[in-house]
Amino acid sequence: MKFSSHFCEGHLPIAFVFSAPGEEEKRKGKPVAGESGANLEAALVHLHSAQPTLFSSLHRYDYRITNSFAEPIAVALGHGKSEADNREIQKPQNVQRVLSELEGCNLVILCGNKAKVLSQAIRESGKTIIEVPHIGNKGLNSKFKIPNQIRSASSFDRRQYRIKLWAEAILQAIARENAT
């Protein structure tokens, strides 16, 4: 299986597209190597439980994973930012790279605003796309509010609740796609 800080070939025809690899991904040489990856694996438990035929594995690296920008970007790496600019993402050679890396995938899940910059190009390539927030803790916290009865739960339990909501958002979007 092919790995780099921004790409995992996987063997299932579902792809997850994130923004850009960071310091952790550069160090480990695999995409979504930190908390986002742990959150993705927790979400796969929910996705597999609800749609075991579609999400047939609980392991993130069984799926295609790429990023809207290939080069690691992080403040910890000396950059003043942690994501590429939209102009960088939309450069023809970058769009072509992403489309090439998505070859063989029918369903593409765009995780976060930077991944969504590629939605038109990916949709025009004939793939089904689902758009959800980034599964990093910041993305989960900003998008999925928790009800009052869960506010006193541990931070781990609140995170698990938000991860379940993220997985449900994917399942609802798939159901809407299938209804059309």
Regions found by a protein language model. Name each.
Residues 2-62, 135-137:
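Adenosine ribonucleotide-centric catalytic and binding domains
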Residues 80-93, 120-180:
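C-terminal capping/extension of enzyme domains
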Residues 26-29, 75-77, 118-122, 142:
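A short acidic (Asp/Glu
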Residues 47-50, 58, 98-106, 173-179:
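A structural motif corresponding to the C-terminal end of an alpha-helix
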Residues 11-12, 104-106, 126:
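A general structural motif
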